[in-house]
């Protein structure tokens, strides 16, 4: 019986299809020549030089920073604070929590910059969530901005790990360089 098995393996036709493991294309993150600045009307942030701004509608501060190398978009939504700061924060937290259904967990990092009056939270949503990173920031008086990452690919956390690592750095850069127009001496 063992001899028959060895003979069968040696003379088996090679044209038999073998399933191949699922593969994912390699993502090449381009070098950042020098930071570019999104100068949306109510705020400005530094971002990777490969990203381009696409305004949405006519409301200032609404649009997407598009990252073509990974089919990623960071959707920015700016809203003026008009006595509704707690409602804006609640909405931002609710939108982040909605992704918890498909997530393996969520962590939050608080960001405070008193000199620029920037106070915010970065949400890291683990697993195969549609939006793995989100943030909001405010000056607690006049300005509120929210950002959410969307990558237009199947949300597989293993294959997207390098992209999520890149965007975690981008979101940190947004929070560290965010300035409100008219509040910090910028024109």
Residue ranges and their predicted role:
Residues 120-127:
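Short beta-strand segments that buttress and anchor functional surface loops
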Residues 109-110, 132-139:
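Hydrophobic/aromatic beta-strand elements that line small-molecule binding cavities or substrate pockets
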Residues 122, 146-148:
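Beta-strand secondary-structure signal
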Residues 1-72, 84-93, 101-110, 114-117, ...:
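N-terminal targeting sequences that direct proteins away from the cytosol to non-cytosolic compartments
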Residues 140-146:
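Short hydrophobic/glycine-rich mini-motifs in sensory/regulatory modules
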Residues 77-78:
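A short gly/proline-enriched turn/hairpin at secondary-structure junctions
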């Amino acid at each position: 019986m063992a001899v028959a098995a060895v003979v069968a393996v040696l003379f088996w036709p090679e044209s038999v299809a073998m399933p191949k493991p699922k593969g994912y294309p390699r993502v090449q993150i381009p070098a950042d020549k020098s930071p570019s600045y999104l100068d949306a009307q109510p705020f400005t942030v530094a971002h990777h030089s490969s990203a381009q701004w696409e305004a949405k509608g006519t409301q200032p501060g609404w649009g997407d920073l598009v990252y073509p190398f990974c089919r990623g978009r960071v959707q920015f939504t700016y809203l003026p604070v008009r006595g509704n700061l707690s409602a804006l924060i609640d909405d931002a937290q609710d939108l982040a929590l909605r992704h918890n259904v498909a997530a393996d967990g969520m962590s939050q990092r608080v960001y405070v910059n008193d000199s620029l009056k920037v106070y915010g939270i970065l949400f890291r949503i683990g697993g195969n969530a549609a939006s793995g990173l989100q943030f909001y920031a405010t000056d607690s008086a006049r300005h509120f901005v929210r950002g959410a990452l969307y990558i237009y690919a199947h949300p597989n956390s293993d294959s997207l790990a390098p992209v999520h690592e890149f965007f975690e750095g981008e979101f940190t850069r947004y929070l560290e360089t965010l300035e409100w127009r008219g509040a910090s001496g910028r024109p």
